[in-house]
């Protein structure tokens, strides 16, 4: 009986030991899983807060007109940030704002503030320095501290569309003047039978290049033979008239001498 009773006890102990181990493992795994879940939730909360802080500081992308790509707005350089005037806040000191627009904290006596000269707004030195590292505008009124590129492009003169090489002068090109003046003397023309030399009627014309152009030699028109014969006849007739007058004078003088004798 004892042998038969011991066998079921050993069998129950052998079968119960794996179940016990599984139960113990389940008990230990539950808190571990719970711990991982809590850590994961904390991590999500941390990421959400960090993203909200970045958005509150203005780390956002802005679209530039005329460009489809979004770029992060760049801030002022360190030299420009240090050039902002520093004022000390006092209770009797009147400022436009009594609260920093970046951290939303009230100004305390003897606080060092930096003032934007354009709009006269004041902020904590650390707050405005952090803001201007990623912005170029006032945190309160959004006034640009640096003129935008579009405004600068409007102020710039319009470039010439025509390159200097392609510019055409409106004045006509002056033709080169030939300083050499060529004077051509007219050839000696033959003298006609009447003893009168025929001279050219037109004078040489000087063109704009300084070269004198002579008229073409015209053929000399000689007196025709009929005209020459007529002249000879006139001369002979004149001589005959003189001889007749002389003869008449001689005969008249002879008659007078005869009458007197």
Swiss-Prot record:
EC top class named in words: transferase
GO biological process entries: protein ubiquitination
Membership in a protein family: Belongs to the RING-type zinc finger family. ATL subfamily.
Protein known as: RING-H2 finger protein ATL58
Membrane topology: Single-pass membrane protein
Entry note about domains: The RING-type zinc finger domain mediates binding to an E2 ubiquitin-conjugating enzyme.
Main location: membrane
Classification lineage: Eukaryota, Viridiplantae, Streptophyta, Embryophyta, Tracheophyta
InterPro entries per UniProt: ATL1/ATL16-like, Znf_RING, Znf_RING/FYVE/PHD
One term of GO molecular function: zinc ion binding
Transmembrane domains' residue ranges: 25-45
Keyword set, alphabetical order: Membrane, Metal-binding, Transferase, Transmembrane, Transmembrane helix, Ubl conjugation pathway, Zinc, Zinc-finger
Catalytic activity of the protein: S-ubiquitinyl-[E2 ubiquitin-conjugating enzyme]-L-cysteine + [acceptor protein]-L-lysine = [E2 ubiquitin-conjugating enzyme]-L-cysteine + N(6)-ubiquitinyl-[acceptor protein]-L-lysine
Alphabetical list of CDD domains matching this protein: RING-H2_EL5-like
């Amino acid at each position: 009986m004892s042998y038969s009773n011991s066998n079921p006890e050993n069998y129950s102990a052998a079968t119960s030991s794996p179940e016990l181990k599984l139960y113990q493992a389940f008990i230990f795994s539950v808190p571990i899983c719970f711990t991982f879940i809590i850590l994961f939730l904390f991590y999500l909360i941390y990421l959400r807060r960090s993203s909200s802080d970045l958005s509150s500081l203005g780390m956002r992308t802005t679209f530039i007109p005329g460009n489809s790509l979004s770029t992060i707005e760049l801030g002022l350089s360190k030299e420009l940030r240090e050039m902002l005037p520093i004022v000390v806040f006092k209770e009797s000191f009147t400022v436009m704002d009594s609260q920093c627009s970046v951290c939303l904290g009230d100004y305390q006596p003897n606080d060092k503030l930096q003032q934007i000269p354009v709009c006269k707004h004041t902020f904590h030195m650390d707050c405005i320095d952090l803001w201007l590292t990623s912005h170029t505008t006032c945190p309160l009124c959004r006034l640009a501290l640096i003129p935008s590129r579009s405004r600068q492009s409007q102020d710039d003169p319009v470039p010439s569309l025509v390159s200097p090489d392609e510019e055409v002068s409106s004045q006509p090109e002056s033709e080169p003047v030939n300083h050499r003046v060529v004077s051509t003397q007219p050839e000696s023309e033959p003298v006609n039978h009447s003893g009168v030399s025929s001279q050219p009627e037109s004078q040489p014309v000087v063109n704009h290049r300084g070269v004198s152009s002579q008229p073409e030699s015209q053929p000399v028109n000689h007196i025709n033979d009929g005209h020459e014969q007529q002249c000879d006849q006139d001369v002979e007739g004149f001589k005959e008239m003189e001889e007749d007058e002389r003869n008449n004078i001689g005969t008249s003088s002879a008659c007078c001498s005869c009458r007197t004798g």
